[in-house]
Amino acid sequence: MGSPHMNAVRWLYPFIHGLGLGVIAMLLHECGHLLAAVILGVRVKNVGMRWNKGLYTVRQQGSPLQNLLIAAAGPFTNILLTLAAPWSPLFGLANFCYAIANALPIEGSDGYRIAKCWQQLRSLQAGKKQA
């Protein structure tokens, strides 16, 4: 049967394990944004962490296309990690959930930034067609 303390530890281990995998998913997500910014030549000013935002990247504004690609790079990284993680279904699930949550077009999310950049790109294209 075991002592009550051992039962608590058995319950706590999967929670801590899942939380740790979630933090790793978040770190890799932000690395995806950072790598995309560097590849696209957008200067990164600061990378930090806040209790209400998790990790964040402060960078110069790029073109609407650069901003769209940088915003999409985070969820894309998590999707790639989901597909590349058959050795750990829990790690795959953490990455999948993180990708979906960030891809939703809710203000402040990557999905919201992607939608705004997409609108800017369409406006620019419409302006070029009229000219």
Report each predicted region and the residues it spans:
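Hydrophobic transmembrane alpha-helices and their immediate loop junctions
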Residues: 1-131
